[in-house]
């Protein structure tokens, strides 16, 4: 059976990003005797959290675990990190103790999937599919990815986010239903925190790409709200308990007031400017402005 050009493009992007991932991470995996390690939160939180969640699900502690601090709700504690991630679900097929050896390979898989999903979206806008593959590499190996290697679960979000952009295009341009709702479901289930930012981005995207240009503004808006709402509702099995857990935290009662709610301090703007023209740095030891800076501030325009 002959593959369609679009499918071939996605497979090429998947394979190319997979190969680049192996070349990038493979050396460090081998150097670590099979284990990919970094420092700080990656070693002390990300890997232990995945091991604990894996063990909790397999032992039936799906609602509460005494192994988290003084005891905590499993869904509330880990839905931000991994519970809704398809990558984490794959690790359930393997022993929890194998996770330190799997992390590097799952990084490679996440980069490959990010390449495939971004290519699926980008190819909708180019005649020569090679440019979609090139764009997929720029996306999956972006500065955000490199700067946030420390945060293992961020890469799950990057891998699946392009699906929502692809889904909204399929819905409003090709008039294919249900695809967008499913992509919203996947992303809402994956990470409630990032999902809020993704929704804001999608609203802006819809307004610029469709609303101000389309003659069927009302119909398009209703369709987006309907499928978006349906996808969000389907994710409620994990999303709702997560939101309830967050709202029960006393910290959410604290408010940012005054100018601090609207603008950064002056040094922060210098940090953003520095990130545009200088390569990203180790988050815990910055060369200037801040001793440690954890806001994923990296762009580096020369690249």
Regions found by a protein language model. Give the residues of each.
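Membrane-water interface of alpha-helical transmembrane segments
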Residues: 3, 7-14, 97-100, 104-107, ...
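Juxtamembrane/interfacial segments around transmembrane helices
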Residues: 61-75, 162, 187-192, 208-209, ...
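Transmembrane helix-loop junctions in multipass membrane proteins, especially transporters and channels
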Residues: 29-36, 96, 174, 210-217, ...
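Periplasmic/ER-lumenal interhelical loops and adjacent helix-loop junctions
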Residues: 44-53, 86, 220-221, 228-303
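Membrane-embedded helix bundles of polyisoprenyl
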Residues: 17, 112-124, 130-211, 223-243, ...
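Active-site lumenal/periplasmic loops and adjacent helix-entry segments of GT-C-fold
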Residues: 27-125, 130-162, 190, 279-281
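Alpha-helical transmembrane segments of polytopic membrane proteins
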Residues: 107, 154-157, 198, 287-292
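Start-transfer (signal-anchor) and selected internal transmembrane alpha helices
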Residues: 1-30, 223, 228
